[in-house]
Amino acid sequence: MRILGIDPGLARVGYGVIDVEPRKGKQEGSQRMIDCGIIRTDPGRSEGERMVEIARDLRQIIRIHQPELASVEKFFFYRSSNTIAVVQARGVLIMTLARFGLPIVEFPPMQIKQALTGHGHADKDEVLEAVMRELNLDTPPRPDDAADALAVALTGWFQH
């Protein structure tokens, strides 16, 4: 199964693509990274134009990698001037995934941390170490948004 993980944002959307294969008779399986990176939007453009950039680039990623499941980080904001724009960008991401008919699972940050490290209060380094271990990577995936998206993809596999 191919899973696309997404770490939503307006300036940078992290994405990570993994392939997973269940092992017979075991709950866990093997997984490997196919691709990861970011969708970067131009801060000099209007929010609407940036949403178009996000949708366009995500469509291309979906067409190239043909995922069977999308796993998206679900986040909660308290007070931030950027909240509305990020929520709108997340809506564009969800809509684009739905247009491709992809099943979508969503996880809050604590659940992602729990799935990868065994506790919901892990720091970024602990999550990164878990991503590297699970995907058998020698070097950390960069940038951080891409590494976060791989964590989201792995959570989709572990929890789906």
Curated annotation (Swiss-Prot):
CDD domains (UniProt xref): RuvC (cd16962)
Ligand binding (Mg(2+) 1): D7, D145
Enzyme nomenclature, EC number: 3.1.21.10
Entry cofactors: Mg(2+)
A GO biological-process term: DNA recombination
InterPro entries: RNaseH-like_sf, RNaseH_sf, X-over_junc_endoDNase_Mg_BS, X-over_junc_endoDNase_RuvC
PROSITE patterns for this protein: RUVC
Principal location class: cytoplasm
Coiled-coil spans in chain: none
Active site: D7, E73, D145
Pfam family, one: RuvC
A single GO cellular-component term on record: cytoplasm
Location within or outside the cell: Cytoplasm
An MF annotation (GO) of this entry: crossover junction DNA endonuclease activity
Residues at which Mg(2+) 2 binds: E73
UniProt keyword list: Cytoplasm, DNA damage, DNA recombination, DNA repair, DNA-binding, Endonuclease, Hydrolase, Magnesium, Metal-binding, Nuclease
Cofactor descriptive note: Binds 2 Mg(2+) ion per subunit.
Family: Belongs to the RuvC family.
Quaternary structure and partners: Homodimer which binds Holliday junction (HJ) DNA. The HJ becomes 2-fold symmetrical on binding to RuvC with unstacked arms; it has a different conformation from HJ DNA in complex with RuvA. In the full resolvosome a probable DNA-RuvA(4)-RuvB(12)-RuvC(2) complex forms which resolves the HJ.
Task performed by this protein: The RuvA-RuvB-RuvC complex processes Holliday junction (HJ) DNA during genetic recombination and DNA repair. Endonuclease that resolves HJ intermediates. Cleaves cruciform DNA by making single-stranded nicks across the HJ at symmetrical positions within the homologous arms, yielding a 5'-phosphate and a 3'-hydroxyl group; requires a central core of homology in the junction. The consensus cleavage sequence is 5'-(A/T)TT(C/G)-3'. Cleavage occurs on the 3'-side of the TT dinucleotide at the point of strand exchange.
Record protein name field: Crossover junction endodeoxyribonuclease RuvC
Organism: Synechococcus sp. (strain CC9311)
